UniProtKB/Swiss-Prot annotation:
Subcellular location: Mitochondrion matrix
Superkingdom of the source species: Eukaryota
Comment on bound cofactor: Binds 1 [2Fe-2S] cluster.
Encoding gene per record: FDX1
Transit peptide residue numbers: 1-58
UniProt-recorded name of the protein: Adrenodoxin, mitochondrial
Cofactor or coenzyme needed: [2Fe-2S] cluster
Length: 186
């Protein structure tokens, strides 16, 4: 079994803080799709986004844009994010109080970061992937302008945009109830 250490940046400790995280399992450190690192977890493998400290970690306020989130309760949460960061990163890094948002931490395994975009912004977004589309099919309140926040990275053209959080959240990871189909072993 392989064991490697992964150097990761910790947003909670500040932009320049670094810590080491052990990777264990037969596939530890193997590269997966898109250059992600596969983490061995109890015999199962899970993809994790690789984090690196780059020039954008020390970006100036000129590289930040303003984003307005209309929360489920109708209140507007205004914050700033770095160009290149995903909307999920913006919510996490700014500790925005959006209940249940980003439960899978951006691994395309839930749909809790479902957002609804303004027409003029939606038209400029990169094409949706099949994987994102599959997750969106499970989202609550799906519209023709829906996307997952973990898949949308900020650009300068998005400055001052408003995105709406749907009224309810559906976590695709909880859509299958195995308890009802399980038989009791005696």
């Amino acid at each position: 079994m392989a064991v490697r250490l992964l150097r990761v940046a910790s947003a909670a400790l500040g932009d320049t803080a670094v810590r080491w995280q052990p990777l264990v399992g037969p596939r530890a450190g193997n590269r997966g799709p898109g250059g992600s690192i596969w983490l061995g977890l109890g015999g199962r493998a899970a993809a994790a986004r690789t984090l690196s400290l780059s020039a954008r970690a020390w970006s100036s306020s000129e590289d930040k844009i303003t984003v307005h989130f209309i929360n489920r309760d109708g209140k507007t949460l205004t914050t700033q994010g770095k160009v290149g960061d995903s909307l999920l990163d913006v919510v996490i890094e700014n500790n925005l109080d959006i209940d249940g948002f980003g439960a899978c931490e951006g691994t395309l395994a839930c749909s809790t970061c479902h957002l609804i975009f303004e027409d003029h912004i939606f038209e400029k977004l990169e094409a949706i992937t099949d994987e994102e589309n599959d997750m969106l099919d499970l989202a609550y309140g799906l519209t023709d302008r829906s996307r997952l926040g973990c898949q949308i990275c900020l650009t300068k053209a998005m400055d001052n945009m408003t995105v709406r959080v749907p009224e309810a959240v559906a976590d695709a990871r909880e859509s299958i109830d195995l308890g009802k189909n399980s038989s009791k072993l005696e």
